[in-house]
């Protein structure tokens, strides 16, 4: 049976919860499209998050890895297109680190594109009535850090497992309603909707070896 690894983060920036973990942990030991789901929580800490991620990949030996993170202020599920090789932290991480303009991997390429079928995922979500779009930037904080580190690891250190390429990428999710009440005017999404959206994303990733040709770009 195939195995899928889904990761999420601990709370950060003064929040009591992180919607990524609240939703991802609902998926532990579930089966989707014939695959077994394993979940792991990552620390919201530069470098340590990647150490934990790589350990989980080595332990689980997944065919697919999707990292999930909080994007407070975004109104929909956003599937990330690209990760860039830069740390530029607006706020300190959970251990007080605040790297500014440092590379994630000193000898790594400038960027990595997601290897998920990002447009098929967005299309599947929209068809199910879940607001979703493609994001052209994962930011420069730990979500981008993890996405870049994941794709670098899969491309170079862990290129193949069980005879096939391991695909990976990142999905951002909005605040939960209980977070949004503390940030007036900020959009939110119900936990049940986010959890359903992640199941759809996993199914789409497992069922589509390639992507579909629909518009997902932006003018600016």
UniProtKB/Swiss-Prot annotation:
| Catalytic residue positions | 80, 143, 172
| Database matches in HAMAP family | Pyrrolid_peptidase
Family in the record: Belongs to the peptidase C15 family.
The processes (GO biological process) annotated in the record are:
proteolysis
| Protein name per UniProt | Pyrrolidone-carboxylate peptidase 1
**Membrane spanning segments where?**
none
**Chief subcellular location:** cytoplasm
Encoded by which gene?
A: pcp1
Key words of the record: Cytoplasm, Hydrolase, Protease, Thiol protease
A single GO CC term, please?
A: cytosol
Q: What class of enzyme is it?
A: hydrolase
InterPro entries of this UniProt entry? Peptidase_C15, Peptidase_C15-like, Peptidase_C15-like_sf, PGP-I_bact-type, PGPEP1_Cys_AS, PGPEP1_Glu_AS
**Free-text function comment from the UniProt entry:** Removes 5-oxoproline from various penultimate amino acid residues except L-proline.
